[in-house]
């Protein structure tokens, strides 16, 4: 009886020690995204002099509009991958008294799209095409007079160029 009790206690103690050495499997954590997703393509579309409506159309509603600085909109985006470190991006858009875009600042690189930033400009893959002889340009043969090709060429030569109209600026005054 005494030996059985001692044996049972020792097996329990050894079992608990073995379990203490094992780690518990991690719990799955989802990615947490918050705020406005602002892509580099959106930033590239912004131009000085744009109205608030045009900026809102491109960027969406601002996450923060400062009550003390009504001419400033802040776009925040944060991503925390499950179990990873939180990453945050910020873009501030500033307007003048005429509600026109004056400047922007924040976490972006002009001219580099998000895809290029993630993938890199050079993927490291080199592809060489087989060498081919350069084609010699064919000499242009004039169309036969009265043929369909001659008629089309005459129509193209007689086309009048028309200047492209510039759009009127949007009226931003209250009605």
From Swiss-Prot:
Matching Pfam families: BamE
Keyword Nuclease applies: no
DNA damage recorded as keyword: no
GO MF assignments: protein-macromolecule adaptor activity
Any one cellular-component term (Gene Ontology): Bam protein complex
Main localization (coarse): membrane
Lipid attachment, kind S-diacylglycerol cysteine: 22
Protein topology in the membrane: Lipid-anchor
Signal peptide: 1-21
Localization of this protein: Cell outer membrane
Domain of life, source organism: Bacteria
Region (Disordered): 117-147, 156-175
Record keywords, A-Z: Cell outer membrane, Lipoprotein, Membrane, Palmitate, Signal
Residues linked to a lipid group, N-palmitoyl cysteine type: 22
One record GO biological process: protein insertion into membrane
PANTHER family according to UniProt: OUTER MEMBRANE PROTEIN ASSEMBLY FACTOR BAME
Family: Belongs to the BamE family.
Subunit structure: Part of the Bam complex.
Protein name (Swiss-Prot/TrEMBL): Outer membrane protein assembly factor BamE
Organism: Pseudomonas fluorescens
């Amino acid at each position: 009886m005494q030996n059985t009790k001692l044996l049972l206690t020792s097996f329990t103690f050894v079992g608990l020690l073995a379990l203490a050495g094992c780690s518990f499997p991690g719990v799955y954590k989802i990615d947490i995204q918050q705020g406005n997703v602002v892509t580099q393509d959106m930033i590239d579309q912004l131009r000085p002099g744009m109205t608030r409506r045009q900026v809102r159309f491109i960027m969406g509603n601002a996450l923060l509009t400062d009550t003390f600085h009504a001419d400033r909109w802040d776009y925040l985006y944060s991503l925390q991958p499950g179990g990873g470190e939180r990453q945050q991006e910020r873009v501030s858009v500033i307007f003048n008294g005429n509600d026109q875009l004056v400047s922007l600042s924040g976490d972006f690189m002009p001219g580099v799209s998000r895809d290029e930033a993630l993938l890199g400009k050079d993927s490291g893959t080199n592809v060489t095409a087989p060498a081919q002889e350069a084609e010699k340009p064919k000499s242009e043969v004039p169309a036969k007079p009265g043929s369909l090709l001659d008629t089309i060429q005459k129509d193209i030569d007689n086309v009048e160029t028309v200047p492209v109209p510039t759009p009127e600026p949007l009226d931003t005054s209250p009605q």
